[in-house]
């Protein structure tokens, strides 16, 4: 698989490419399936339909890897929290974790068992996916998942979570430890079910100052990486801590690929990290609105990463109103230009 070869810093005939959120609302085929089942969570839990939308971008766009269709918040949902997705507001937890009693109600064992629909999605997808296409499993980072569990929803300031960090760090560490232990088993089950690699998304890493990031986020990400590598050394691990360009010189750990967001210059990230890790990224997602903007960025990024281990991706997820034709153009352009 060209994607796995790139993860492991092997030479590839061209630069493999995929997009975060590639199984999503910009695709009419995805919306048709989602509307058939009734909604986002219903689609996550319907393994046959979830498998179908996982494969769609491979068939429609020609990306080099499929990423499991699911959500990072199925973890707290299946631990016992009450999750709703509300249009215009996003995910909402009716009863956020506020104290030890709330935490005691959540079950690691229950979550790992209840997530069978994810494992079934993986098994079916791996069976149907072309043999040369990688299947990416994933989870949210403990810190990012914790922000939703504690805040009850998305936040601009994360003040509830950060208040806990500075006033009761021991309790926050307890929450993060429970999430981390659950994620270890969750990713292990994804690997057993057939994923070829896993990505850990830390979407809200940028909410933390440097010292707090390494204590309350990175430490737990690396604990998960160490667990996976000890048992499955052949499985590449991708980490994506968004918005931490100022901390790159302090990054360490037992992973293979470092995801670079669009706000981080790829050239500076490469100088610090390319000797040890494959870099993934990092075109600005809004460039997909215009083919000239796509072409300019693709050429610049390929030039920057020439001769260095690289997986092409966006610097964050594709947006719902991107024209499918532009997404196809992007994938094709990367594959063609990088093969010259």
From Swiss-Prot:
Stored Gene3D superfamilies: 3.20.20.210
Q: In which pathway does it act?
A: Porphyrin-containing compound metabolism; protoporphyrin-IX biosynthesis; coproporphyrinogen-III from 5-aminolevulinate: step 4/4
Q: Where is this site: Transition state stabilizer?
A: 71
Q: What catalytic activity is recorded?
A: uroporphyrinogen III + 4 H(+) = coproporphyrinogen III + 4 CO2
Pfam families recorded for this chain? URO-D
Q: Can you cite an annotated GO cellular component?
A: cytosol
**Residues the record lists as binding substrate:** 21-25, 71, 148, 203, 316
The record's InterPro entries line, in alphabetical order, gives: UROD/MetE-like_sf, Uroporphyrinogen_deCO2ase_HemE, Uroporphyrinogen_deCOase
Listed GO biological process terms: protoporphyrinogen IX biosynthetic process from glutamate
What keyword terms does UniProt attach to this protein?
A: Cytoplasm, Decarboxylase, Lyase, Porphyrin biosynthesis
Q: Does the keyword Cytoplasm apply?
A: yes
Grouped into one coarse class, the protein's main location is cytoplasm
Q: Which top EC class is named for this enzyme in its record?
A: lyase
MF-aspect GO terms: uroporphyrinogen decarboxylase activity
Task: Specify whether NADP is a keyword of the entry.
Answer: no
Subcellular location(s): the record lists: Cytoplasm
Q: What is its EC number?
A: 4.1.1.37
Q: What does this protein do?
A: Catalyzes the decarboxylation of four acetate groups of uroporphyrinogen-III to yield coproporphyrinogen-III.
So what family is this one in?
Belongs to the uroporphyrinogen decarboxylase family.
The annotated subunit structure for this chain is: Homodimer.
The protein's matches in NCBIfam families, at most eight in alphabetical order, are given as: hemE
Identification of the protein by name: Uroporphyrinogen decarboxylase
Q: Which organism is it from?
A: Campylobacter hominis (strain ATCC BAA-381 / DSM 21671 / CCUG 45161 / LMG 19568 / NCTC 13146 / CH001A)
What lineage, starting at the top, does this entry show? Bacteria, Pseudomonadati, Campylobacterota, Epsilonproteobacteria, Campylobacterales
């Amino acid at each position: 698989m060209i994607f796995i070869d790139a993860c492991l810093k092997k030479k590839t005939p061209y630069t493999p490419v995929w997009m975060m959120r590639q199984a999503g609302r910009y695709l009419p085929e995805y919306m048709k399936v989602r509307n058939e089942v009734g909604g986002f969570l219903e689609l996550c839990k319907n393994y046959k339909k979830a498998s179908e939308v996982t494969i769609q971008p491979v068939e429609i766009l020609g990306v080099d890897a499929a990423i499991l269709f699911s959500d990072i918040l199925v973890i707290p949902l299946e631990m016992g929290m009450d999750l709703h997705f509300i249009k215009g507001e996003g995910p909402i937890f009716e009863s956020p974790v506020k104290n030890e009693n709330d935490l005691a109600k959540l079950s690691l064992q229950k979550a790992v068992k209840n997530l069978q629909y994810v494992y079934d999605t993986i098994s079916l997808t791996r069976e149907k996916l072309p043999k040369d296409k990688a299947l990416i499993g994933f989870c949210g980072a403990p810190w990012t998942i914790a922000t939703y569990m504690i805040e009850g929803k998305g936040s601009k300031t994360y003040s509830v979570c950060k208040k806990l960090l500075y006033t009761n760090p021991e309790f926050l560490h307890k929450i993060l430890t429970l999430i981390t232990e659950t994620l270890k088993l969750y990713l292990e089950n994804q690997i057993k079910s057939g994923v070829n690699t896993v990505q850990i998304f830390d979407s809200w890493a940028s909410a933390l100052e440097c010292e707090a990031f390494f204590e309350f986020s990175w430490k737990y990400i690396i604990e998960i990486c160490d667990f996976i590598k000890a048992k499955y050394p052949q499985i590449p691990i991708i980490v994506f801590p968004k918005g931490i360009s100022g901390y790159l010189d302090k990054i360490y750990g037992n992973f293979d690929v470092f995801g670079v967001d669009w706000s981080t210059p790829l050239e500076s990230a490469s100088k610090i990290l390319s000797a040890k890790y494959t870099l993934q990224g990092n075109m600005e997602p809004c460039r997909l609105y215009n083919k000239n903007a796509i072409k300019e960025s693709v050429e610049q990024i390929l030039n920057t990463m020439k001769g260095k281990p690289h997986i092409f991706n966006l610097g964050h997820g594709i947006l719902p109103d991107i024209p499918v034709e532009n997404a196809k153009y992007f994938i094709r352009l990367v594959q063609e230009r990088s093969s010259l």
